[in-house]
Swiss-Prot record:
One of its GO terms (cellular component) is nucleolus. Its EC number is 3.6.4.13. Its main location: nucleus. ATP-dependent RNA helicase required for 60S ribosomal subunit synthesis. Involved in efficient pre-rRNA processing, predominantly at site A3, which is necessary for the normal formation of 25S and 5.8S rRNAs. Residues 190-377 form the Helicase ATP-binding domain. ATP binds at residues 203-210. Keywords: ATP-binding, Helicase, Hydrolase, Nucleotide-binding, Nucleus, Ribosome biogenesis, RNA-binding, rRNA processing. Residues 26-43, 94-124 have a biased composition (Low complexity). The gene is DBP3. The Q motif is unique to and characteristic of the DEAD box family of RNA helicases and controls ATP binding and hydrolysis. The keyword ATP-binding applies. This is ATP-dependent RNA helicase DBP3. GO terms for molecular function: ATP binding; ATP hydrolysis activity; mRNA binding; RNA helicase activity. GO terms for biological process: endonucleolytic cleavage in ITS1 upstream of 5.8S rRNA from tricistronic rRNA transcript (SSU-rRNA, 5.8S rRNA, LSU-rRNA); rRNA processing.
Amino acid sequence: MTTSATEKALEDRAKSLHKKEKKASAKAAAAAGASASTSLEGSPSPASPAKKDKKDKKDKKDKKRSADDADADDDEKAAKKRRKEEKKAKKAAAKSGAATSLESTPAASPAPAASSSASAASFTPTNPAAARAFVESHNITIEAPEESNERPPLPMVDFRELDGKVDAAVKKTLDSQGFSTPTPIQACCWPVLLQNKDVVGIAETGSGKTFAFGLPALQHLVTKHKVLDSGKKKAKGAQVNVLVIAPTRELAIQTEENMAKLGKSMGIGMICLYGGVSKQEQVRLLNQSPPVRIVVGTPGRVLDMARDGSLDLSGVTYLVLDEADRMLDKGFEPDIRAIIGMCKSREEGRHTSMFSATWPPAVRGLAESFMNGPVRVTVGSDELSANRRVEQTVEVLADGYAKERRLNDFLRSVNAQRSKDKILIFALYKKEAQRIEQTLRRGGFKVSGIHGDLGQNERIASLERFKSAETPLLVATDVAARGLDIPNVEHVVNYTFPLTIEDYVHRIGRTGRGGKTGKSLTFFTEMDKAHAGELIRVLKDADQKVPDALTKFPTTIKKKTHSSYGDHFKELVPGKAKKITFDDD
């Protein structure tokens, strides 16, 4: 019995009872006299004990029948759910490449030609032994969702394994990039995403995440949205199909540039949306030809343009949240939830990818809210730890005045005035960054800066000069500590220690990327003593030398849990003052 039928039956019984109660009330009123009255709901005055007992039995019988009907309805729903799960398990076991219905695989596309589109079948590597060795050598963990009985797919360790699984144009574009082998995060995410499944990728910035979700995004467009490429608009704003959200303008620009290397040769329009520049110009670019299918942007600007009607997110079926932990740290969770609510739902076939450097409870909660049984891929550890390929040097200085002299000594020791080696220098505040930049420039060094006081165009220009080694020194605040993938940074200098140990780990992670080694130099003073214990732990975990002077500071670590930062979070907000009162003598 369906829910609507059950409700109708209950309503009919209620009407019948109401009529009988009115008749009984009339008889009771006649017997008791004019003083008898009924309640507002039409309940009768007390009748004879025999009639009352008979009525109570009937009421109990009707209630029991209604409960039985409801239980039967619940049993029917449970049986239907079991049949659906059994059907899904059989299809997975059969490993059929045929297209399935929307109920079983929401984003399955009409079966395309075998030569030009991805197969929906489970991926099997040509050399399983090599794939397992790849997983072990790179310390990779691949976990299938708990509710699934399927084994997680092994990685694609060779680009040739993409043949026949992606469109020929997508494969040709990838081949033109000149890569020799996939990175660990790419090798593990491609088999999952090309099967139209959700994925959570835990890996450090600079590990190749953009191509990990970028290549499947292009394949998704070629198969699922090929019919939409006529460019005819059905909504007020520009309708897009792939949306990538990043926490900062710099990371969004960088991600769009990397995706453009793959997509623009295929004629797929894409745009980067971020604040600090003209919104009118971005609206104009959104409506250009070829029509924009991919948007990469920051949460604030994307939500702003979606709300004012410039951007239509109702057609988004491929969603990527990049640096998810960083976005939650910056307080973007409400914006992210609002944006996801404007996209297609999971039931309508939206696929979601989430990438993060760590896996704190807040990120897990976001994944549980919006993802559909994701496969979790972890490269390395999901705990915050320093890159072992970075040689960490910590110098304990008497005071802050010694930093400037020591920085000059270091730069001259590595011949920074003539060398093209890239050195990234971190300051804590923008005023401090400006002062360091000016001092170095007066000393004859080629240096650029990136901090909050610079306009967007100035920041982009500084980054480009640093990337090209035109100015091999870059002084930055923590705005550049996460997300930016600047290749071939040889040295990182922490002129001032950051506010948290997490920021320290992310700062030194700017070097030693892509399998290369790097070096970091950190100046530590009495002002930073609260971080001594945490810094010693990070150094020991990475098998680095701990200077004797550092161990002289208090090393107690208050282990607290924070929704975004995880353990070892130092609460900087002072507690509420306590009022002390004394008893009168």
